[in-house]
UniProtKB/Swiss-Prot annotation:
The gene is Gad1. One of its GO terms (biological process) is glutamate catabolic process. Catalyzes the production of GABA. Substrate binds at residues 107-109, 483. This is Glutamate decarboxylase. GO terms for cellular component: cytoplasm; cytosol.
Length: 510
């Protein structure tokens, strides 16, 4: 059932009221407030139902200028009636991509976990900040419990962690802590007292946020040394050591190495143990960006060899809003050493972080972070963990990997139509669709160019039809190819078949 903006009617009286006629402005408006909110919930629940209906479109696509004409985006000078606000809610969701739809394979973060969603509703209702225990006591304690559990899963008995607004900021916290650990005076004196130029290392398949750290923190992207990867997308560790020695010979100071556990495009896992050996040899901080692949830490079947040696890292980024299915946003950064976060980022603002409070101020988290205020991202994860249990998360990871194997099987069974690019380590499946005119043509670089031209055409048709969303992109070895992501618990084998069949229907004539 598509959402009909005109299908959600408040009573005639309530519909004519404005927000000023509801609580808290009008304290006696309990019945009207309840009627309004229940109608909003009707809209939300219908969207949940539509999201899980395979007969519904994934999206109703319109080009930006056309979309502007369909929507009333004006922000008025005077308050609009409540009925209009209800229609605004329904209209917004009518044209929103259903990222929880079983035929949405487009992004790393997809799915609509209803327990996590319920947690986000409660979080919005509580509307509290996460910088001190005095205003968020329950949520601060939840955060401690969940993050301690995640560090134990990594393999650490102590340490410290924080929830950050996305994997990019989590990686930034790792960079800042690494620099502070090696040069604690940098916080006060900046680069003036450094004995040389700092350099960091990461693979050419890393998330762009690693280079962004170098830019944001004044290192400069020229000093973020890119290490080549092999044909599977893994960092070539011999090249890492060669480049470290090369920069040391120039007088530079290697201090930070990023290993990626689940690259964005190919889903590759760098060789953590070998990189840890190199970091130990040359006294470099080892960070693991497991924003994408971190969920597999919970699977005894798939944890090794992908994460063998993870406990040797100094810091780990892990995003539950990806493979674990928590709602956006839910990103964590973990440190082996306790006390680094507070030492690195503390500014001791006396209007927030007084030392003479009536409770243990070690529970105040605001001075650990550069943000001050933090959104409450913990409750939805805590509630989801309670609902699934650690065993449930493990089963979820195993099921996603099982579906990937099913997709590989179906691709191999249709080898005339599909060309698998490589065996995936994660839930990223990279492939080309081969239309009728190119079947039987020997596979070479020239054919790959033609296959690459087909991807954006099929994606365009896909979006116009609205039945499916699968991403595509090039990399440094290949022209455009499809990259499907199976990270939603809603997906089953029939959905994988639909994906491949629909790509064939949309592209066979090209």
């Amino acid at each position: 059932m598509s959402l009909n903006p005109n299908g959600y009617k408040l009573s005639e009286r309530t519909g004519k009221l404005t927000a000023y006629d509801l609580m808290p402005t009008t304290v006696t408006a309990g019945p009207e407030t309840r009627e309004f909110l229940l109608k909003v919930i009707d809209v939300l629940l219908d969207f949940v139902k539509a999201t899980n209906d395979r007969n519904e479109k994934v999206l109703d696509f319109h080009h930006p200028e056309d979309m502007k004409r369909l929507l009333d985006l004006d922000v008025p000078d005077r308050a609009l009636p409540l009925q209009q606000l209800i229609e605004d809610c329904a209209t917004t969701l009518k044209y929103q991509v259903k990222t929880g739809h079983p035929h949405f394979f487009n992004q790393l973060s997809n799915g609509l976990d209803l327990i996590s969603m319920a947690g986000e509703w409660l979080t919005a209702t509580a509307n509290t900040n996460m910088f001190t225990y005095e205003i968020a006591p329950v949520f601060i304690l939840m955060e401690n419990v969940v993050l301690t559990k995640m560090r134990e899963i990594i393999g650490w008995s102590g340490g410290d962690s924080i929830l950050a607004p996305g994997g990019s900021i989590s990686n930034l916290y790792a960079f800042l802590a690494a620099r502070h650990k090696m040069f604690p005076n940098y916080k006060e004196h900046g680069s003036v007292g450094l004995p040389g130029t700092l350099v960091m290392f990461t693979s050419d398949q890393c998330h762009y946020s690693i280079k962004s750290c170098a830019a944001v923190c004044g290192l400069g992207t020229d000093h973020c040394i890119v290490v080549p990867s092999d044909e599977h997308g893994k960092m070539i560790t011999s090249e890492l050591e060669r480049l470290i020695l090369e920069r040391k010979a120039k007088g530079d100071i290697p201090f930070f190495v990023n290993a990626t556990a689940g690259t964005t495009v190919l889903g590759a896992f760098d060789d953590i143990n070998t990189i840890a050996d190199i970091c130990q040899k040359y006294n470099c901080w080892m960070h693991i960006d497991a924003a994408w692949g971190g969920g597999l830490l919970m699977s005894r079947k798939h944890r090794h060899p992908r994460f063998t040696g993870v406990e040797r890292a100094d810091s780990v980024t892990w995003n539950p809003h990806k493979l674990m299915g928590a709602l956006l946003q839910c990103s964590t950064i973990h440190f082996k050493e306790d006390g680094l976060l507070i030492s690195c980022n503390q500014m001791s603002a006396e209007y927030l972080f007084m030392t003479d409070k009536q409770y243990d101020i070690s529970y105040d988290t605001g001075d650990k972070v550069i943000q001050c205020g933090r959104h409450n991202d913990i409750f939805k994860l805590w509630l989801q963990w309670r609902a699934k249990g650690t065993e449930g998360f493990e089963q979820q990871q195993d099921r996603l990997m099982e579906l990937v194997q099913y997709q590989l099987k179906r691709i191999r069974e249709q080898s005339d139509r599909f060309h698998l690019i490589l065996e995936p380590e994660c839930v990223n499946v990279s492939f080309w669709y081969v239309p009728k005119r190119l079947r039987g043509v020997p596979h070479d670089a020239k054919k790959e160019v033609e296959l690459g031209k087909i991807c954006p055409i099929i994606k365009g048709r896909m979006m116009q039809k609205g039945t499916l969303m699968v991403g595509y992109q090039p990399d440094d070895r290949r022209p455009n190819f499809f990259r499907s992501i199976i990270s939603s618990a809603a997906v089953n084998e029939a959905d994988v078949d639909f994906m491949l069949d629909e790509i064939h229907r949309l592209g066979d004539d090209l």
